[in-house]
């Protein structure tokens, strides 16, 4: 179940104000954020946002295809190291 249309998309206020400032000045800087739940809006396209994954900030370049998704979708929090190796060779 999605968010109500009358509410509009969620975006953290501090993140929105930083992006609007950069758009007014026509600047491109890396913006650090911990707000993984913020929705990507069209005014964010072209910016690089460093999204926190629990350990470090992962730089995410925003493209048009990402609009409508959440920032956290592009900064994975878990590292897959493969399934456990079988010990069949040791049992021979």
From Swiss-Prot:
GO terms for cellular component: cytoplasm; small ribosomal subunit. The keyword rRNA-binding applies. Keywords: Ribonucleoprotein, Ribosomal protein, RNA-binding, rRNA-binding. One of its GO terms (molecular function) is structural constituent of ribosome. The keyword DNA damage does not apply. Belongs to the universal ribosomal protein uS19 family. PANTHER family: RIBOSOMAL PROTEIN S19P FAMILY MEMBER, SMALL RIBOSOMAL SUBUNIT PROTEIN US19M. Protein S19 forms a complex with S13 that binds strongly to the 16S ribosomal RNA. This is Small ribosomal subunit protein uS19. The gene is rpsS.
């Amino acid at each position: 179940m999605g968010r109500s249309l009358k509410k509009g998309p969620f975006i953290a206020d501090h993140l929105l104000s930083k992006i609007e400032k950069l758009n007014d000045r026509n600047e491109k800087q890396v913006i650090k954020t911990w707000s993984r739940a913020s929705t990507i809006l069209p005014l964010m396209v072209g910016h690089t946002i460093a999204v926190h994954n629990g350990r470090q900030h992962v730089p995410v370049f925003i493209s048009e295809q990402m609009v409508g998704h959440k920032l956290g979708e592009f900064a994975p929090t878990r590292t897959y190291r493969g399934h456990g190796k079988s010990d069949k060779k040791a049992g021979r």
